[in-house]
Swiss-Prot record:
<feature type="binding site">
    <location>
        <begin position="134"/>
        <end position="135"/>
    </location>
    <ligand>
        <name>L-glutamine</name>
    </ligand>
</feature>
<feature type="domain" description="Glutamine amidotransferase type-1">
    <location>
        <begin position="3"/>
        <end position="196"/>
    </location>
</feature>
<dbReference type="Pfam" id="PF00117">
    <property type="entry name" value="GATase"/>
</dbReference>
<comment type="pathway">
    <text>Amino-acid biosynthesis; L-tryptophan biosynthesis; L-tryptophan from chorismate: step 1/5.</text>
</comment>
<feature type="active site" description="For GATase activity">
    <location>
        <position position="170"/>
    </location>
</feature>
<dbReference type="InterPro" id="IPR029062">
    <property type="entry name" value="Class_I_gatase-like"/>
</dbReference>
<feature type="active site" description="For GATase activity">
    <location>
        <position position="172"/>
    </location>
</feature>
<feature type="binding site">
    <location>
        <position position="88"/>
    </location>
    <ligand>
        <name>L-glutamine</name>
    </ligand>
</feature>
<keyword id="KW-0028">Amino-acid biosynthesis</keyword>
<keyword id="KW-0057">Aromatic amino acid biosynthesis</keyword>
<keyword id="KW-0808">Transferase</keyword>
<dbReference type="InterPro" id="IPR050472">
    <property type="entry name" value="Anth_synth/Amidotransfase"/>
</dbReference>
<feature type="active site" description="Nucleophile; for GATase activity">
    <location>
        <position position="84"/>
    </location>
</feature>
<dbReference type="GO" id="GO:0000162">
    <property type="term" value="P:L-tryptophan biosynthetic process"/>
</dbReference>
<keyword id="KW-0822">Tryptophan biosynthesis</keyword>
<keyword id="KW-0456">Lyase</keyword>
<comment type="subunit">
    <text>Tetramer of two components I and two components II.</text>
</comment>
Length: 201
């Protein structure tokens, strides 16, 4: 079971994601991205083995409220999982580029190829997933491992040492056929090195 602070980037998918996580027994608290980063860091410090999850949302990562500041201040200090806009924010935070994907997707099912490692272990390959995006990450820096792609576009990244990962697609969507398992394996991967104490306290 994980204690998850879910940052809501003002997106209806946030609540689908929260429902999926809660149905698997995780504790989830939701805060919108207009809350000051310091307030959320203080809230995370009260949680037992916290995980920060960054939701999908409209627009570009740099304009998503406190999300860029949270990544700057918390990367490497606790596990962070980003979805869609959250994934793009992770790419930017590590020095990558986020630009137009060349098409606007809203509920498009695509079969992505993945490396079969870590959170993708044992999953169907190619894996059918749901894509809702017009932007995509590129020029991925050396610190991030590209662990899934579709037609040359980056669909997932991870940073093993910092316990940070991002998915361009939506694991919580019914169109992502093994999304619930992927989320569970991602949380297990993210928490693998956590000690019983909270390093933010």
């Amino acid at each position: 079971m994980a204690d998850i602070l879910l940052l809501d980037n003002i997106d209806s998918f946030t609540y689908n994601l929260a429902d999926q996580l809660r149905s698997n027994g995780h504790n989830v608290v939701i805060y919108r991205n207009h809350i000051p980063a310091q307030t959320l860091i203080e809230r995370l410090a009260t949680m037992s083995n916290p995980v920060l999850m960054l939701s999908p949302g409209p627009g570009v990562p740099s304009e998503a409220g406190c999300m860029p500041e949270l990544l700057t201040r918390l990367s490497g200090k606790l596990p962070i999982i980003g979805i869609c806009l959250g994934h793009q924010a992770i790419v930017e935070a590590y020095g990558g580029y986020v630009g137009q994907a060349g098409e606007i997707l809203h509920g498009k099912a695509s079969s992505i190829e993945h490396d079969g490692q870590a959170m993708f272990a044992g999953l169907t390959n190619p894996l059918p997933v749901a894509r809702y995006h017009s932007l995509v990450g590129s020029n991925i820096p050396a610190g991030l491992t590209i662990n899934a792609h579709f037609n040359g576009m980056v669909m997932a990244v991870r940073h093993d040492a910092d316990r940070i990962c991002g998915f361009q697609f939506h694991p919580e969507s019914i169109l992502t056929t093994q999304g619930a398992r992927l989320l569970e394996q991602t949380l297990a991967w993210a928490q693998r090195k956590l000690e019983p104490t909270n390093t933010l306290q």
